Structure formats: C-alpha cells, structure tokens
Amino acid sequence: MANNAELIKQCEERAQQWLTPAFDEETRNEVKAMLEAEDKSALVDAFYQNLEFGTGGLRGIMGAGTNRMNKYIVGMATQGFANYILKAFPGEENLSVVVGHDCRNNSRLFAETVAAIFSANGIKAYLFESLRPTPEISFAIRELGAKAGVNVTASHNPKEYNGYKAYWSDGAQVLAPHDTGIIEEVNKVTIDQVKFEANWDKIKIIGGEMDYDYMTAVHTAMIDQDVINRQKNLNIVYSAMHGTGRVIVPLCLRSWGFQNINVVPEQMVVDGNFPTVVSPNPENAEAMTLGMKLGTKLNADLVVATDPDADRLAIVCRDDKGEWMIINGNQTAMMFCYYIIENKKKLGKLKPTDFLVKTIVTTEVIAEIAKKNNVELRDCYTGFKWIAREIAISEGKQQYIGGGEESFGFLPYDKVRDKDAPASICLICEIAAWAKDQGKTLYDLLMQIYAEYGFSKEFTVNVVRPGKTGADEIKQMMADFRANPPKELGGSKIVTWKDYQSLEAKHADGSVEKLDMPTTSNVLQWFCDDNTKVSVRPSGTEPKIKFYIEVKDPSFKCAGCYNRCTAAAMDKIEAIKKSLNQD
C-alpha cells in the first residue's frame, strides 16, 4: 500500500476530478471542503478506492467520493447494468426493469437516478411511486416480466449507509454468469458515459395495483384459514422499524383474518435516521424495546417487527414465566419448517415432491424435522439467492414449500424469490394462532420441537479485522485452517471436515466424498461425533470472519430442561471458542 503522503496525493488528484462541471454544486462544495481541510482522513476515506460493485451490488456510506454511495457512483453502476442487459438481450424490443427503494436518506433520489438512466438507454423502467418492501420488488419483476430489477436499500445497516441490489428476470438477486458479467460492465464505465437525462416515455410509475397483487400472492402462503378464524383476536403488536413494512404488513395481516393488530406508533413513522433505535436490525434485542413495552401494556400474545426494507423479521413471544423472549433466526426457521410440514400433512396438502431449503450454516434441527417426516431438505450457500436458485431449478418438477436462513430471513412460498417478511409475519401469526388454539404459546411450541427433534444451541462469533491488514489476516486464518485443520473442538472429536472451496468432505475413516454444490465457496465446516457443527466463512460484505457454532444436547426432554441445557451448551461453546483461539 502507498505510504501516507503518496496516498494523500493520489486521493487529492482523484478528488480534483470531482470539481469539474460534470458534478453538481453540492458535491463540488463537499469535495472542496475535504481538499481544504487540514486533516486529510475524510478525503482519503472518500477517495482511496472505488466503492466496489460486488456480487450483491453496492453498499457503502453516503457522501461525495469514489468510495461513497452517491448519485454518480449509482449512475455508473446503473449504466454498466444497462449495458449488460442490452448485451444479454441483443435486438430484443420492449426490455424493462423494476426499480424500488427503501426508507433511507437519499433512497428516492438514487431510485429516480436509476430509472432515469435505464430509460435513457431505451430500457423501460417501472418505478415504484414510493418506498416498498424488498419482496414486493422481487414479486413485481416476475409479475411484469421484467428482465431485471434494482432495489435501493442497505437493509438493516446503520443510517449512514445505503446500497444497491441487482436482480435478474426470475426476481432473485443475480447469480453466475450474470453477477460477474455485470461487474465487468460496471468496471468499464466512466462518469462521462453515464446517460443521466431521463426519457420520460420509458418511465412508468407503479404502486397500488402491484400492492394488491402482491398481497394476493402473500395470501397463498396461508395453510389453515380455520385456525385463524377461531383465533382472529390473537393480540399482535407490530413495528415497521421506520421502514417499508408500515402499510403492507398490517394490511396483509387483516387480509388473513387477524383483527387485533396494534402498531408501535413511534416506529411507524418513515425516517431514514431511525431515531428510536441504535441500529434497525431485528437481530438486536435493543431494537425491539418499544415493541415489548407496548406488548406488555396491551398484554399481547406476540410482538413482531420487520427491518427497514421488510425482508427480515423479528419475533418476540412470552416464555413459561410470561416474560418476553426473542426467538432467534434458527428457532424461527425451525418453527416455520415444523408447522409447514405438520399442518400440510394434517390437511392432506403435503406431497412427495415437496421440498424445503436451508443454508449450510442454519440449524441441523431442520434436517431432523425433514428426515423424520420424509420431506426432502436441500442445503445451499449463505444468501437468499441460493435458495431462489433451488426453487428455479425445480420449477415445474417439484414444489418448494419453505426455506430460510439463521439471519432472520424466511420465504414460505414461491411467488417471490427473496426473503419475505410480510408473508413470514402472517405465517408466524398463523402458527401462534394454531398454538393458542391448543392452549399453547410459541414458546411451548418451541419446547415441543426440541423435545421431539433434539435440542440445539447456536452461536455466531464475529471476528472483525478492518482494512487491508485485516483482509490479509482473514485470508491467512482460512489458509491455516486448511493447512492444519483442527482434530477436536472443545473436547469433541471431529469426524468430518468439509471444504467448499475444494468441494470435498473428508471423513475420519480416511474416505473422501465430493460435495454436490453449484459452485465453490470459501467456507469450511467441521462435524463432531456428538453432532457439534462449526462453520467458518469470511463475510462477503464486511471486514470480518464468522464462526457459526451449533451444539446439541440429547438430554433435553421437556421445557423444564431448557435453562439447564442452554447453560451447558454455552459452556461448550466457550470451550469451542477457546480451541479456535476466538475466546
């Protein structure tokens, strides 16, 4: 890496290019201030590299500069995407894309910029009239027969961030070969090649009709209308976390037959600054504080929330003492899979060709549920585009009935090809109604699943290593694990080592088998003789490496064992962290 003086000089030269008339006055003033400041750290951070358009699109802090989310970086990304679409469908007329956005600051500006550039390139842009949930954008791409789509969102990241997700014609985020093809085109674009001037004949505003069609599709995820009719007064508290679920989720719940829906008023206000939470992430208990407070006041049965772009959900239920308990992403996926199988079976709707999908880092309890019920379960890589791929390759042959991942994302039907929080919230409320119909809570149901299929405790360790030195360190950690794989984890003997880069599974008896995956991935997994599972993968979007630990306890027999088994599992997890030098 260049030394400090060299780096500052390079950044100053890059910044000077942003003082030309190609950039607006506001941008020029921001860059000027960075150039004139004595402290050059802001300048360096904004210009030391280009914000990378990766396989998931763009994500970064908003502001002026090559390493920031702004309309010029969004513009170059869109011009590259448009160039790729035109090459992918040569000579084809009436090409179209769908453009949507979330509640974040500048999201509307970026979405309008995207629509303008597509239209200027002769591609019709269906632009949503205002913010919409991510799953509705996926649905609209399929419904309108569009060739691609763009969603301006940074999901649950802090307020300083925004992002750009690229979708293909199936409504899923782009996979090979399109992902690398788009990246190649984006990397060729210079600012003077971007066609910013909109062709208004090629822009169509969409909204209400698509909302209705999407909500009609969500309705098809319902399994048992009768149980909802009996428990229509289930006491539900909902929070939109200042985002896109604010209108759609309550409407979907009412259309399913739920009549007692209470919203967290402070969090139904659209606000890209997310003033009521530290971080708008449903994985953080703090973000659910206001919902739980209202739930206590109203004596609610459960509290549910969506993240700002409404692709992920959070669920809070009452435990055996009546206290609020956050159901984690693995437990959520378990409950969905259990309920879908149990009730489709009971109602005669389960078919031999039905299948479920989970990511490789998600709990193996789902595998037990599927196995005991003779339902096919497929494992795929982390990221919902891989679940979408499994749906796509089986279309017309087998029926997808549900799939999810540990990071609070689930899709209970095949009308959408991304995580769908509105549909998932409706289904979890149906599950809560089903439990209540039997005099149980979601907590009781969770304990029942553990008793029947085995207890597991999952824990994720995030090791953050920022900057270039951090990236090198993460690379070295993975290389070391490959060169000298561990033999045991926290006292448990490893019996299988899986490497998704070489696509091999090596067993303790010396046998080797090929892993059946669509491509390679930089992931390692270790399985122990006591069913402990550890997965290691560097994050694709952040400077960190993740360790996903899953520990089993066969001694779990009933709800009374929960605290004991959880404590024992946490002790085991600490021992595993120690053996991996991550304590």
Where are the regions that the model predicts?
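An N-terminal, well-structured beta->alpha segment
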Residues: 5-114, 200-236, 244
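Conserved phosphate/anionic-ligand binding catalytic regions in large, soluble enzymes, centered on
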Residues: 47-67, 154-157, 240-248, 252, ...
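Phosphate-binding and adjacent anionic-ligand microenvironments
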Residues: 296, 300-302, 323-325, 343-537, ...
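Short acidic, glycine/serine/threonine-rich loops at helix termini
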Residues: 108-113, 138-142, 160-166, 195, ...
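Gly/Ser/Thr-enriched, mixed-charge loops and adjacent short helices
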Residues: 18-22, 26, 42-51, 162-289, ...
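N-terminal small/polar loop signature for handling phosphorylated ligands or for N-terminal nucleophile
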Residues: 98-161, 259-315
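Glycine-rich phosphate-binding loop plus the immediately following alpha-helix
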Residues: 167-195, 330-354, 358-367, 421
